[in-house]
Amino acid sequence: MHDITDLPAWERLFKKIVWKQLGDMEGKKILDFGSGEGITANHFAEKNDVTAIEPSKEMLSNAWKDYEYTQIVGDVNALSAFKNETFDMIICHNVLEYIDDKAAVVKALARVLKKDGIISIVKHNRAGRVMQMAVLLDDFEKANEILDGKDSTASKFGTIRYYEDNDITKWEPQITVSDILGIRTFWDLQQNQQKHGDEAWQEKMLQLELRVSQMQE
């Protein structure tokens, strides 16, 4: 049985924040598109009917599957197997940045989402990346490039192609943005690695992150 404490501290905090924001779900049909190692799919599969789609066989070799869920190896084309309005909830976390045709993916996801369903999209924050480059990495050249609208990179996944929140509704007008929440606002600013490993500190940080995640400014 996998446990969230098996994850690096930063990822553990990320998952806890996102799961808390999504809320407790039971008896729902959920799609995790770009499911990676299946950590979130596995979490919600305890009480829900979950389908996970992931193109990387390498990531799936380490998949968490303590609870039963359907795993599909594939990409957006795999969605053609599902009828319109199949899912109550669609999870698409840190995925669209790495896709060339974002509009096609968003439209395909919207098709299989129920009329009263919810799609949870987690995206990279351009301003946060600029702060990371300027404050933490002392890379002013890269910070300015990102401010100028250029792409960035992630060591594990490649080029990060940033997009804005309102792009989502431009790609698919049937989707409306009901809420915008923050994730991991403060964590990376603490550079003391010993602090990161302190469970009491982690809990205090989690509560603070959750508190500010709903603030609009």
Write out the residue ranges for each language-model feature.
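A short SAM/SAH-binding and catalytic strip from SAM-dependent methyltransferases
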Residues: M89-D101
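A C-terminal cap/extension of S-adenosyl-L-methionine-dependent methyltransferases
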Residues: K170, D179-E217
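Conserved class I S-adenosyl-L-methionine
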Residues: M1-E26, I39-H43, M59-N62, I118-I146
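Short alpha-helix
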Residues: F157-I175, I180
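A short glycine-rich, Lys/Arg-flanked "PGG" loop and its adjoining helix->strand segment in the class I
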Residues: A103-I118
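Class I SAM-dependent methyltransferase SAM/SAH-binding core
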Residues: E37-A78
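A short acidic, Gly/Pro-enriched loop at the edge of an enzyme's catalytic core
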Residues: A81-M89
